[in-house]
C-alpha cells in the first residue's frame, strides 16, 4: 500500500512527546548549490536495509542526505554519533532533517520546550545537522489567527534554541498551507509574516503546492530570499482515483518548471537543493533517485 508523505508524517513525526557522478560530462562543472536527497524518497528500502540503501545512494553520487526518521533518539535505528559515522564512512553528511514540532513539545506553563524536543535538537546537532526542519502543522494550530500566531512564536523560540547549537530551525510546506485561509488570509502568508526570517528559515517544496493550484515560481518571486532550502520535486497528473490530482515524478519529466524554479531560488540565495520523489510511475525508487541526480547535475547542481 502506498503511504503518502502526509500519512507518514502524521504517524511517525508526531510520535515523539551527494561524490560527483561517474560520467565525465559533469566532472568539472562548478555546482550551483549543495545537492542532497530526502531519504523518504527511498523510504521502503531504508526500512528494510538502511545501510545497503545508503551505500546505493552514495554510489549514485549524493553527498548529502536529509532524514525523515527520528524515533526514540535514533535515526533509522542508529544513535546520532553512529549514524553520523556511517554517513561519513560513505562520504556523506546530513545537513538537515525532518522532525515535526508539535504542540506537545511546548510546555505553556513553564514557557519552555519539553525535554523530548530538547533532545531532538541535541541529537540533530550531534548528527551534524545544520537545520532542524518541521514538515507539518496540526490543524488545531491554525483554527484561529491568534492560535497560529501563538505557535509561530514557538517557532521563533525554536529558532533561538537551535541557534544555541549552531543550527537553524525551518518549516517545510505541503499544499494545505496554500489551500487554507484563516481570517481570509492564506495560511502560508501568515506563517511567513509571523516568523522571524532570522530565526525560522523556509524549505519550499517545489511540487507539493501544485495540488493547491499554486506554482512554486510565483512563490519564489513573492518571497525572494526566504528559501535557504528547497525540496526539488517535479509533478505529473496522478492516475484516476488517486488521493490527489498530482504526484511527484522524475525531475524534468513533469510540469512543475523545476529548473526555472531552482535557478530563480539559487539566484535569490537558496543554498540547499534536496531531491524528493514520493511516487515512481512503476520505476524502482532507487532508479528514480539516480535519474533525479543526473537531472540535477545536468542543470548544474
Where on the chain are the PLM-derived regions?
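A short helix->loop->beta-strand "cap" motif at the edges of active sites that frequently abuts
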Residues: 92, 129, 167, 268-271
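H/E-rich (His + Asp/Glu) clusters that bind or coordinate divalent metals
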Residues: 251-254, 259-262, 268, 272-276
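Acidic/histidine-rich catalytic cores of soluble enzymes
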Residues: 64-65, 162-255
